[in-house]
From Swiss-Prot:
Keywords: Chloroplast, Cytochrome c-type biogenesis, Membrane, Plastid, Thylakoid, Transmembrane, Transmembrane helix. It comes from Daucus carota. Pfam families: Cytochrom_C_asm (PF01578). The chain crosses the membrane at residues 15-35, 44-64, 71-91, 98-118, 143-163, 228-248, 255-275, 289-309. The lineage of its organism: Eukaryota, Viridiplantae, Streptophyta, Embryophyta, Tracheophyta. May interact with Ccs1. The gene is ccsA. It comes from the Eukaryota. This is Cytochrome c biogenesis protein CcsA. It is a multi-pass membrane protein. Required during biogenesis of c-type cytochromes (cytochrome c6 and cytochrome f) at the step of heme attachment. GO terms for biological process: cytochrome complex assembly. Belongs to the CcmF/CycK/Ccl1/NrfE/CcsA family.
Amino acid sequence: MIFSTLEHILTHISFSIVCIVITIHLITLLIDEIIKLNNSSEKGMIATFLCITVLLVTRCIYSGHLPLSDLYESLIFLSWSLSFIHIVPYFKKNKSHLSTITASSVIFTQGFATSGLLTEIHQSAILVPALQSEWLIMHVSMMILGYAALLCGSLLSVALLVLTFRKNRNLLCKKNPLLLKLTEEFSFGEIQYINEINNIFGNASFFSDNNYYRSQLIQQLDYWSYRVISLGFIFLTIGILSGAVWANEAWGSYWNWDPKETWAFITWIVFAVYLHTRTNTNLQVENSAIVASMGFLIIWICYFGVNLLGIGLHTYGSFTLTSN
């Protein structure tokens, strides 16, 4: 009873703090001069990380196993992973644009985990025999860490695409204001093509101060997106391989083409394509960003969408799971 009450308190404290943090982030995005608020938001995320850490430890103590056995616990661990990714640049004194994305991701996952949709599986249950293995820690933790990193990297790529489109659109409109309304009908590739033609014929200077800042921001987004996705890809690979070994021990086969396994493989393929296009110097940065943006949807289908089906070998922790 005490552990359950403590867990309930920590869950809502962490959610409340992260709500305040995301509000501060939105304010600092509008007013860059408020440095104290920015520092407060970073300290708030550290407090959120500590609350979620204590929450996981508490649940581990009274359940007798690492809290990774169902959808609720995996969502809490996903929030912890996103919080960890958020505070790493802070301790390295390296300011990045990852913070706004990770903070918003934490509030989404933490909010959903504490919502009424998962009420049936908030209480810890005894592990089914198939999950009573040392591979549970290795496989699930690597997969969740991989999901967290890939989600953050994918969102950075989405932001990169938005900024690139706006930059190309603004450049085109500055060179010919009459095309302001027409650009809304152009595709991303068409706008880039028109900008290249305008540059060939020697129009006005390519970069204004605003466009220069935007170009620098795009480069930073690409830098962090590539590195975070690379880290997530490593975690995902380790998670899939450890899961295959565990499956062979539990079911006598390394691969069964279970829905979760199939979508995990699709996720791996998508981000392998991303890494290939990103390292290919003949391709533009936007090409790899488009692949990563597609990967964002694939991850949610793999992680969350398959649980809605309630079929296959990975049905533990779906909405139909109840406490024993």
